[in-house]
Amino acid sequence: MHALRALDTLCENMEYNFRALEEKWAPIWERDRLFEVDENDSETPRKYVLDMFSYPSGDLHMGHAETYAYGDFIARYWRHRGYNVLHPVGWDSFGLPAENAAIKHGSDPKVWTYRNIDQQARSMRLYAASFDWSRRLHTSDPEYYRWNQWLFLKLYKHGLAYRKKAWVNWDPSDRTVLANEQVLPDGTSERSGALVVKKKLTQWFLRITAYADRLLDDLSMLENNWPERVITMQRNWIGRSEGVSIEFNIPTLKRPVTVFTTRPETIFGVTYLALAFDSEVTEELASKSGVLGELLELRHNIDKTHEGVRGLDLKSFAIHPLTGQSVPIFAASYILSDYAKGAVMSVPGHDTRDERFAVRYNLPIVKIMEDNRLISSGKYSGQSVTQARENITRDLCAKSLGRREISYRLRDWLISRQRYWGTPIPILYDSNGSEIPVEEDDLPVLLPDSEGIDLTPSGLSPLGGIHDWVNLHKAGSLFRRDTDTMDTFFDSSWYFLRYLNPDCDTAPFTLEKAKKWGPVDQYCGGVEHAVLHLLYARFITKFLYDIGFVDFKEPFLRLINQGMVVLNGAKMSKSKGNIVEFSKEVSQHGVDVIRFALIFSGPPEEDIDWKDVSMTGAARFLSRCIQTAKEVPKRTADLSLGDIELRKHTHSLLNDIDWLVDSYRFNVIAARLMDLLNITRKKIQTIGADNPAIREAIETIAIALDMFSPYTAEEMWEILGNKYSVSKALFPEVDTTFLEQKTTCAIVQIDGRLRGRLNVLTNITTEQLVHSARSLPAIEHALSGRSVKRVICVPPKLVNFVVEPK
């Protein structure tokens, strides 16, 4: 024990020399291109592990450190399980931050972007993420965005890309349009934080709504493999609603306005119609009744203030389809023009928003429901809600005043952006303004250099000011290029496929490679992309499936969302001055310590408070790993002579690693490694370091540690005299003879009531558990003469006999 305490003291006093390890191994790994996949290997099973690629806004931050630690953990795990692992790297390098930085500093967004990419690449290499650097890509490279344009043209050819004049979300700060998904619930821009206003512009859209049902239905394929909250968020965003479209005739227009409702049974409670401020019907009615100026002013002010519920009496009436009574029509700020019909039959007696509006504008409030039955509803009074819903729907349809319909919250994807740093839209316009798609042979439509371009946001596309670029003479005719650029979420909607053929110049990727590697087995990134990026990627994948470019319907089989790295409970922010700098932490503590400490801090989905991350403990553990490896003789011995107790601990860990990785309990593996090291070091004092079980334990620790701290693991592997590299080493086979058969208490029930308990092995089968339960005297007596309808068995915890009534 004295020697053990001496070694512990040595480790505690000895500085963990992370810098020497990093300087030793990083250049060797880079020289050997250790993590490039072997495309010629057709025998080894394959896995595709992908981290959400980075935006190059500066150096890496601690959020990147966490994401890459988890993604690399999983990639290395599958290599240790004998898989050929594709783990590529790239940059989402188009976008507003680069353009805004260029405006602020008077620089070129391209120079700013690629300088940051170079900085991040250096940090990533040092961080020892096991990327295949030969597949590196940047979405701002012409070799990449050429295929953005190709994909856009495919969508256009199939009627899924179209241009129309529409009310759009306008960011007055960045002076560009936003997709609905980029507007936060409080009406502000996701990126700039500015209050978003409505503006009518001619824009390009992608018809994602054509895939609404498939996007919704196929979420069932992802259950248990994606976080439930992400599936719920997507399901809610798509927002499928079954209901009825009902026509309310407007005499002054001599035509009806159509409303959509999921509650037709409330039609007798309608006391006013509410129309969206920005609908054409609203403007037409306002014009006829002389309140158009008031409407436009109110709409403008609402865009600026977003205050409460606002409305305007349009001094018009609609005819109730069942009662024939006149119903007043109002413009209301809470009605969205791009959802359902942009018109609502308002029932203030049974809807809180309608009630607030009715109270504010002194409109009637009528109750038409009591104890789940209709009242004051004509011939439908007394019917249950369910009966009335069906009967009213049937009668409206029979009179051609209504029709059954399905509505979606999901809107088509607006991809036009009035900014410079993005993919040019590959469309020309002739002298008549007709759209002409650019020929595929003429791709890419290159983004011109920014020199001489005024990038200051003006509401107009900067590309429009480059006349030599905009105007194109072809075949004796003059054409104009489209001057908008694409939403950068288009770039990231398919990037995972370009990694399969990053150098291919005849296609974005080949079906052969898509079949070989796709879909992505494990995707790692933040939950902030739950609706935007992930929904768009699913849409594009389904389109590519439809046109025969991939043979799978979902892009990402499994998804892990990590929590945030915060400081003192608050989100890190430069403006708050509470940033933890990645480069400073790496310089002070080393890569391995940071990676181990981050993963050890808790389950991936939980936030990590940096103040609680134990660097000292991680450094001490890694130092002990190396020092203990030095104690182990390099010679091999017969494992059958190894200490049985230690081998039980080692094989228990090996047995549990698979399910711990599968359930993302990486922190538990870290704790188990620390336990195994402590047990091994104590065993050295009693059985000696030359016992074969010692070497087996330390080699197992080295292989598992590679998933956390690769520099330390590689050093241990070399010290142990093993063949380079530890990243290629396979986990030892589990010897089940060393696994203890543990017991647990099983509950035995009859019709859900406790009738007995059993002490059983944890690996008991269903048949064994049912047989043992039946053999209990109390159960045997209770079941005597009774018929068992079914048996519910959840080994090793529960047996429930469901019996026929006496």
Curated annotation (Swiss-Prot):
GO terms for biological process: leucyl-tRNA aminoacylation. This is Leucine--tRNA ligase. Its main location: cytoplasm. It catalyses: tRNA(Leu) + L-leucine + ATP = L-leucyl-tRNA(Leu) + AMP + diphosphate. Belongs to the class-I aminoacyl-tRNA synthetase family. Pfam families: Anticodon_1, tRNA-synt_1, tRNA-synt_1_2, tRNA-synt_1g. Its EC number is 6.1.1.4. A motif ('HIGH' region) lies at residues 54-64. InterPro entries: aa-tRNA-synth_I_CS, aa-tRNA-synth_Ia, Leu-tRNA-ligase, Leu_tRNA-synth_edit, M/V/L/I-tRNA-synth_anticd-bd, Methionyl/Leucyl_tRNA_Synth, Rossmann-like_a/b/a_fold, tRNAsynth_Ia_anticodon-bd. A motif ('KMSKS' region) lies at residues 571-575. NCBIfam families: leuS_bact.
